[in-house]
């Protein structure tokens, strides 16, 4: 492999391609003369579009094919939305870099209404995220919530066709695809706690590939890493997957980190919440401690019930 060449495995969706192009541009910026190739490929998550994610295996659906490409030396790195990255990595692969975070909030998208509070009784809202569904049902039990799969363009088309009164998407995806004008309003973290890692881009590579790791190093954003590591540590301790509504959101002020988390029933009938503050350098410890607090407050019974049905 040429010392000055790097191959990026990426999904083919517009948002995944944006992320890969972003990393390509950053690599070209910090390493003038580098040759960066994109290798677009389909994953199971891109193919199975008629079934809710929670029912077909969850987050790993979007990364497995990319990981195989790296393990077989067909690609050097893979670029992911951090909220799609599973907790565990195959042997020989690891998360090397977390890039600076885009807006982590959820976005309310509607052609008719400006916010959730404006929605009339019984309005239809589209989202496949159990985390969003749970928090929405808790605040607005009158709403009819329907699953919504597909890439961002497909989801917007379904809204425009009148299948939904509103849909909820990650703000970061709309901003990156230059579709900010479609955002009727941003949903505060207090109203809808984001998913762990939402808005952040991660780069995975072979753990023994020192050449690639050295090329990637300048793309690391340490503050984003602290935040995402805390959020993921909480999720890991809870053994959270796509079948359970879990939200985690860390903010940093100076050297202090505040991490908020929640676990809910999918129907929104019960939500366990918690918050913890501590040194940002102890991100993992804070995430685990908050998870323990949530478990002791009743999250364990919610998780046990959900996994018993799975």
Swiss-Prot record:
Cofactor needs: dipyrromethane
Annotated cofactor note: Binds 1 dipyrromethane group covalently.
EC number: 2.5.1.61
Gene Ontology CC annotation, any one: cytoplasm
Enzyme class: transferase
Pathway(s) where this gene product acts: Porphyrin-containing compound metabolism; protoporphyrin-IX biosynthesis; coproporphyrinogen-III from 5-aminolevulinate: step 2/4
The protein's assembly and partners: Monomer.
Protein name: Porphobilinogen deaminase
Designated gene of the protein: hemC
């Amino acid at each position: 492999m040429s010392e000055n060449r790097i191959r990026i495995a990426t999904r083919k969706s517009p948002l995944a391609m944006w992320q890969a192009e972003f990393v390509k541009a950053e690599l070209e910026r910090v390493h003038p003369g580098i040759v960066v190739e994109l290798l677009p490929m389909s994953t199971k998550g891109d193919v199975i579009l008629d079934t809710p994610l929670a029912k077909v295996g969850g987050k790993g659906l979007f990364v497995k094919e990319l990981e195989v490409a790296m393990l077989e030396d067909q690609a050097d790195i893979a670029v992911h939305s951090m909220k799609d990255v599973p907790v565990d990595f195959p042997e020989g692969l690891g998360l090397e870099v977390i890039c600076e975070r885009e807006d982590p909030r959820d976005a309310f998208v509607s052609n008719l209404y400006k916010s959730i509070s404006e929605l009339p009784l019984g309005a239809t809202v589209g989202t496949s995220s159990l985390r969003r569904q749970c928090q929405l049902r808790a605040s607005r039990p009158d709403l009819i919530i329907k699953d919504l799969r597909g890439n961002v363009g497909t989801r917007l088309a379904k809204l425009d066709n009148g299948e939904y009164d509103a849909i909820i998407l990650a703000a970061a995806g709309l901003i990156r695809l230059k579709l900010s004008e479609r955002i009727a309003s941003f949903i505060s973290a207090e109203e809808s706690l984001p998913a762990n890692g939402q808005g952040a881009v991660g780069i995975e590579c072979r753990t023994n590939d020192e050449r690639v790791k050295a090329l990637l190093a300048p793309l690391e954003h340490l503050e984003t890493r602290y935040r995402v590591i805390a959020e993921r540590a909480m999720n890991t301790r809870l053994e959270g997957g796509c079948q359970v509504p879990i939200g985690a959101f860390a903010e940093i002020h100076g050297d202090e980190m505040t991490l908020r988390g929640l676990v809910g029933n999918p129907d929104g009938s019960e939500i366990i919440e918690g918050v913890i503050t501590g040194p940002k350098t102890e991100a993992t410890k804070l995430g685990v401690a908050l998870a323990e607090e949530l478990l002791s407050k009743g999250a364990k019974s919610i998780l046990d019930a959900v996994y018993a049905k799975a």
